[in-house]
Regions:
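Periplasmic/extracellular loop-to-transmembrane helix junction in inner-membrane transport proteins
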Residues: 1-29
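Short cytoplasmic-facing helical segments at TM-TM junctions of multi-pass membrane proteins
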Residues: 100-139
Length: 277
């Protein structure tokens, strides 16, 4: 088994790197979107407890829906590929970030709030100088939980053509190849452990937290945004479709060609009919 894993890592090095990049890009893009939704929403609702509780209930209900069911519901609406995978991951990631941000902002000691008001700080200045710095450890904890969950769940993107490390797991299951399953699972676990450790490391020190937050934002916005956009809007590719001998396979490959060219007029589709087998 050990030799088989080493051989696969060497022979499939390019595919593994590509799948890892896809996995990270999908995860970071999903995290970025979830943060842009959850953190501002928690800030807006920190003084509206009933609405915030209702939002938490809705987010909790979404968390109980199986991921495969969400993907199945999204396919008829947005099709297959990266888009439904990102939407599903965002839905799962919102609750921990929103819950922790809201808790961090609402559990600040009242005497500190009163002191800030007595100094004449506006709501924005109070948020900027008092509330967000005090709530930041809780916010980072929510982001860490969401990111680990996203990285683990992103393996399901392979089921709908979204790419990522799940392609190795899926290929291994279909071909009864335990080596592929182990490689996909171990790499996913390593990514989850690394990003969890990174966020925990920067949250233990104020200076480290500031530098780390800037680095994470740059990484998420740059790598996640650019790679995620590439995954959602891939460059035109050449497609080769092979079919067995006979009239029915010949009809099928021509149908596939028409369907592909309807979706992407620039796609170059090459047909290879009359394959034996």
């Amino acid at each position: 088994m050990y030799n088989s894993i080493l051989h696969t890592l060497q022979s499939q090095q390019g595919a593994i790197i590509k799948a890892t990049e896809q996995h990270i890009s999908i995860s970071l893009l999903s995290l970025l979107i979830a943060m842009l939704i959850a953190i501002p929403l928690a800030i807006l609702l920190k003084d509206h407890h009933k609405i915030a509780e209702a939002c938490l209930q809705v987010a909790g209900i979404i968390q109980t829906i199986p991921s495969l069911a969400i993907l199945g519901l999204l396919i008829p609406i947005v099709g297959i590929g990266t888009v439904p995978a990102v939407i599903a991951l965002v839905l799962y990631a919102i609750m921990p970030i929103f819950q922790n941000t809201y808790a961090g902002l609402t559990e600040i000691a009242p005497n500190l709030e009163e002191a800030a008001t007595a100094f004449g700080l506006t709501k924005w200045k109070k948020l900027q100088r008092l509330e967000l710095p005090l709530a930041m450890p809780m916010i980072l904890s929510g982001i860490r939980i969401s990111l680990v969950m996203i990285i683990g769940t992103a393996t399901l993107a392979a089921l709908i053509g979204g790419g990522g490390l799940g392609t190795f797991i899926l290929t291994g299951i279909q071909s009864n190849n335990n080596t592929y399953v182990i490689i996909g699972a171990i790499l996913s676990a390593i990514l989850a452990f690394f990003f969890s450790w990174l966020l925990k490391f920067i949250s233990t020190n104020t200076r480290r937290m500031r530098i780390g937050l800037i680095a994470i934002l740059v990484m998420v916005c740059g790598f996640g945004g650019y790679k995620g956009y590439q995954a959602i809007r891939p460059a035109p590719t050449k497609v080769v479709i092979a079919g067995k001998m006979g009239s029915e396979p010949d009809i099928l490959i021509h149908m596939y060609k028409d369907l592909i060219q309807q979706e992407d007029l620039r796609a170059e589709v090459t047909l290879k009919p009359n394959f034996a087998g």
